[in-house]
Amino acid sequence: MEGPASPARAPGALPYYVAFSQLLGLIVVAMTGAWLGMYRGGIAWESALQFNVHPLCMIIGLVFLQGDALLVYRVFRNEAKRTTKVLHGLLHVFAFVIALVGLVAVFEHHRKKGYADLYSLHSWCGILVFALFFAQWLVGFSFFLFPGASFSLRSRYRPQHVFFGAAIFLLSVATALLGLKEALLFELGTKYSMFEPEGVLANVLGLLLATFATVILYILTRADWKRPLQAEEQALSMDFKTLTEGDSPSSQ
């Protein structure tokens, strides 16, 4: 009798790309904190610094944690599918909660200062991204974690789930870049063109954000780095294929 199949080995370069993405993500979070601390006075909830909670939370939630959530199926290649699903979903929950705190912070700050809401391109994109993120999580939970969805429905929806997950992540990064530029223009005005230290730091932060997104997207699009099907997943896939071809799965 044959022994159990040995777990598939991760492609050689994958761990290095994942490690590089995490290094970039941590640097982005640290640089965001440094920018807010050095040039915007830091963060606080009950003061004029409440606005600064917004960019930090959005970078942590909708950029760093969302990117990590997308990598779960690449990093945990041989763990049980249920475990990876739960981790994938939980990371999105953490990202959503942190982003929600950031969203509340900016609306509270605007209310206290009497500023207008939702007039800029950044704010429109932000609301769109937040709504899409929440909808994606709800639909994903219904199909992949809630026990009522059939295997056939999951199989049909999976490509859309993967595509919109990556698209929402890229939109999140683009929205963060818009917000970064908007914050610089409001604060620095014409001094932005004079290579002010804050502007240079924020520009480097923007480049690192774009690089982080590029590395995440590259990892996701490498077909040979996809999570291999486990034995039980292969059996379900074969049974579904047999059913769709008009036969019944073998009962032997």
Swiss-Prot record:
Keywords per UniProt: Acetylation, Cytoplasmic vesicle, Electron transport, Heme, Iron, Membrane, Metal-binding, Phosphoprotein, Translocase, Transmembrane, Transmembrane helix, Transport
Main location: membrane
Cofactor(s), by name: heme b
Residue intervals annotated with topology Cytoplasmic: 1-17, 74-86, 147-159, 221-252
Residue positions where N-acetylmethionine is found in the record: 1
Modified positions (Phosphoserine) in chain numbering: 248, 250
Binding site for heme b 2: 74, 81, 88, 161, 226
Effect of residue 88 to Y: Decreased heme b binding. Loss of oxidoreductase activity
Residues passing through the membrane, by range: 18-38, 53-73, 87-107, 126-146, 160-180, 200-220
Positions on the Vesicular side per record topology: 39-52, 108-125, 181-199
Keyword Disulfide bond: no
Biological processes, Gene Ontology terms: ascorbate homeostasis
Protein location: Cytoplasmic vesicle, Secretory vesicle, Chromaffin granule membrane
Pfam families recorded: Cytochrom_B561
Binding site for L-ascorbate: 81, 85, 154
Catalytic activity: monodehydro-L-ascorbate radical(out) + L-ascorbate(in) = monodehydro-L-ascorbate radical(in) + L-ascorbate(out)
Family annotation (PANTHER family): CYTOCHROME B561-RELATED, TRANSMEMBRANE ASCORBATE-DEPENDENT REDUCTASE CYB561
Function: Transmembrane reductase that uses ascorbate as an electron donor in the cytoplasm and transfers electrons across membranes to reduce monodehydro-L-ascorbate radical in the lumen of secretory vesicles. It is therefore involved the regeneration and homeostasis within secretory vesicles of ascorbate which in turn provides reducing equivalents needed to support the activity of intravesicular enzymes.
Record-given protein name: Transmembrane ascorbate-dependent reductase CYB561
Species per Swiss-Prot/TrEMBL record: Bos taurus (Bovine)
UniProt gene name: CYB561
